[in-house]
Amino acid sequence: MTFGKGKKPLLIISGLGDGLATVKGMAQMLALAYRGFTTAYQVYVFSRINELPENYTTRDMATDIAEAMDVLGLKRIAVLGISQGGMLAQWFAADFPERVEKLILTVTTAKLNNLGRERITRWLELSQTGAYKELIFDIVSHSYTAKSFGKFKYLYRIMGIFGRIKDKQRIAIQAISCLRHDSLAVLEKSKCPTLIIRAEEDDVLGVGASLELHHHIKDSQLTILLDCGHALYEQHKDFQKRVLVFLES
């Protein structure tokens, strides 16, 4: 999927939510959500491939991104990876360094800590029992700050009533790939300018994940956005501004 009026390419790699719904048919919504990028950039948003094989890893997913770029004729691109998308972006920058102009790793980790493992395992269990309402409620309750969650919790309860899990295997394979993700040994291979963005109140990955990335990626920049949770890319009004400043620097 692509949108935007600019000439410079920007790739956005989405998170684990791709296991529940791909980006197909969501161009207008995504263009609105990421409107801060659409003037200067031609934005590409990739879902995972349609048929996910067993034992499909975050590294495999990164290789698929390189192949998709070949099809589109994209040689070199700025990459914004969010949550699980950041895991893919780490492998992409390590395995295909010549293709990454700049890298933004947002609310992501090189390896899940105990908190992240607890969250993903819980979501995996709920997804496999078909408990869509409980799954959505649990994701949202841990992704937003208590203040933000309080405003929208009834809306998400209603959404949970009418939604359903379309493909249990798809979400399971992606969740398991998160649980197995470990890129610590290759982070030093990433040579491009890198911005790491952390949420002050991240209740999915905690605060240590971004610090670990910053420690292992040489000359990386670390930005902490205050008063927001894991869903900072939706919550924080300065998120896109910070990314643009980095991209244009």
Where are the predicted features?
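Conserved alpha/beta-hydrolase "acid-adjacent" motif
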Residues: 203-209
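Short beta-strand/loop motif that positions the catalytic acidic residue
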Residues: 190, 196-198, 202
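Gly/Ala-rich beta-loop-alpha elbow adjacent to hydrolase catalytic centers
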Residues: 81-85, 89
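Flexible "cap/lid" loop of the alpha/beta hydrolase fold
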Residues: 94, 101-130, 170
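Conserved alpha/beta-hydrolase catalytic His-Asp/Glu region
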Residues: 114-117, 134-179, 186
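Catalytic histidine-centered segment of alpha/beta-hydrolase-like enzymes
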Residues: 228-240
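Conserved HGGG/HGGXW glycine-rich cap/lid loop of the alpha/beta-hydrolase fold
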Residues: 1-52
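Conserved acidic catalytic loop of the alpha/beta-hydrolase fold
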Residues: 60-77
